[in-house]
Structures are given as C-alpha cells and as structure tokens.
Amino acid sequence: MIRGAPAPMAEPPPVIFCHDSPKRVLVSVIRTTPATPPCSSVGEPEPPPPLVPTSPGFSDFMVYPWRWGENAHNVTLSPGAAGGVVSAGLPAATELPTLRGAPPSSASVAAVSGGEDEEEASSPDSGHLKDGIRRGRPRADTVRDLINEGEHSSSRIRCNICNRVFPREKSLQAHKRTHTGERPYLCDYPDCGKAFVQSGQLKTHQRLHTGEKPFVCSENGCLSRFTHANRHCPKHPYARLKREEPTDTLSKHQSTDNKAAAEWLAKYWEMREQRTPTLKGKLVQKADQEQQDPLEYLQSDEEDDEKSGAQRRLQEQRERLHGALALIELANLTGAPLRQ
C-alpha cells in the first residue's frame, strides 16, 4: 500500500473500528451525522480523538453521568436563587439520575443542600399561628425588613427607638429591654444572682436549681427526661416531648447540704402548691405554651392575651372602614352641586 493513499471503500465500514471505545460508539450513535474516523495505515500513529465529542443538543457530561464531576465548573447558577437553580443546559440536580458507586457531583450536592436550607427557613414550625400572626424570635436577616416595614405601618404598638411594630404590647415591652439592657427578673437562689429579660426565662432557669425535668420522651418505654421543651431525645430524635408534672420522689424531696438552698427549695414548692389549681385550669383549657413554641415562651413575659389582641385588630379595621365611608360621603356631597 502506498503511503498516503486512501483506503479502498469496497465494503461498508463496520460498527466498531480503529480501536473505538464504547464511549465513542455511544456518541457516534447520538450524532445526527455519524463521522467515520479514517483508518490509518500500518506504522502510522492514530490521530488523537477530540477531547469532548459533541452532538446537536447534547454535551459530553450529560451523556456520561460519570463525568458530571469533571464538568461541574461548566454549571451556571441563576442569580438570586438561594437553592442554586441550574441553568437550562443541565437538568436540576435533584432530577439527575445517579449511578451505583458514582460519587455525586459538587453541583448536585450544592443544589440539594441549598434546597434543604430553604425548606428549613420556610418551614411551618418557624412560628405561625392560626390567626396568621408570626410568633417567636425573628431571623437575623429579617430584622432590617421588619424595621423598614414598621416605619410605614399604622400600628400603634411600635418601638420608639427602632420603629419595629409588634402584634402584642407585651412583646413590645420585652423588645424594649434589648435596647435598655434591663433584666428585671432576678434569680433569688442562694449564690446565683443571674438576671433575665423575661419571666419565662427565669422560670426555665430555676428548674436547674430544683432539678425539675417536666418534659419526657413520648416513645413508649423511654425514661429520658428533659428540663427544656426544645430538647430532643438522643435515642428517639424524632419523637415529640410531652409534659408531665414532677413527682415527689423526683423533685420535692431533693436533698441538699446547703441550709439556705434547702429553705429556698421549701419556699419554692410551697408557692408551687398555691399556684397548682390555677395552673391545672390553664392546662385543661390549652396545651402548654412552652412546648408549643419554646422561643416565644422565652420571649414573652407571660401568657399572651389573644382575645384582647383580636379585639384591638377588629377595632382598627372598623376605624379604617368608617374613614373610608366618610371619604365617600364627602365626595358625594362635593359632587352634588356640580351635577345640578
């Protein structure tokens, strides 16, 4: 055979030739116009194949899932999308098929983790009530928006320092202490001296002195007890906590060598006994507030008066309605002489 002469084309070329790999064959099948690589003569080195074979509408990292990680830098994210929305050139990371034993790409991991963060940020457990009022401590990145919203709000429950508005007067009073640094609720346990912004924080803190653990794991047979309602059982992390009143053996007969501490404990349980009928009546009417929303329990001084808040909102709506009716009546009176 003469060097440089073209190969005879007497027979159609086979499907696999010139040491083609299965990967190259797959791309050749996808191509709309298959390209037949030329056979080289004896002794002449085979020209290297193109690094990334392409075809109309497809790219190499889409055809071969095991190369997604190599092309992660080619994936672009839409600006402003918190979860990482993948551009039109690549399907969403959660929709991409996975191969057994193939590690996930950095793009898919970023998209999935971003989606989880969004879901956690917008979850219903973040503190929404049936009446539509948000409860609990707001997220740090929303405080500035709340302040800007309060500057244009007609609510009378407004902080005179930062212009934030609140749905309840007690929430406003607790918020003002963040500006003044006031901590009016002092723990009187011997040698403690800690002070708190809300009374709910003081009550929760005093359980450390009394040894109370009123919250128990709801899993059958589990004896784990907790001081706070926002804890999770290490053995059953998905089980809810339920409240049980402390028994005599757990708390009331707690022994201590300190005489002052013993007197404080005796006084504490005496006051608890006096408040017991009132507390039981409240527990029958509604579930424990701290277990429903621990963050709001720590922020509020006492149990919020939902009825008075609803009446106040209703009164504001009536005032707006009366104002609108007065404007309509005034417009009718001024327009009557013109029509005559």
Curated annotation (Swiss-Prot):
Give the Phosphoserine positions (modified residues).
300
Point to the regions of Basic and acidic residues compositional bias.
127-140, 307-317
Q: Where in the cell is it found?
A: Nucleus
Q: Name one GO biological process term.
A: regulation of transcription by RNA polymerase II
For this UniProt record, give its keywords in alphabetical order, as a comma-separated list: Activator, Coiled coil, DNA-binding, Metal-binding, Nucleus, Phosphoprotein, Repeat, Transcription, Transcription regulation, Zinc, Zinc-finger
**This protein's GO CC annotations:** nucleoplasm; nucleus
- State where it is primarily located: nucleus
One MF term in GO for this entry?
zinc ion binding
Matching InterPro entries: Znf_C2H2_sf, Znf_C2H2_type
Zinc finger spans (C2H2-type)?
Answer: 157-179, 185-209
> Which intervals carry biased composition (Low complexity)?
101-114
Q: Pfam families recorded for this chain?
A: zf-C2H2, zf-C2H2_6
Coiled-coil annotation reads: 299-332
Where does the record place the region Disordered?
96-140, 280-317
The record's family statement is: Belongs to the krueppel C2H2-type zinc-finger protein family.
Q: Please explain the role this protein plays, according to its UniProt record.
A: Transcriptional activator. May be involved in transcriptional activation of erythroid genes.
The molecule here is called Zinc finger protein 367
Q: Which organism is it from?
A: Rattus norvegicus (Rat)
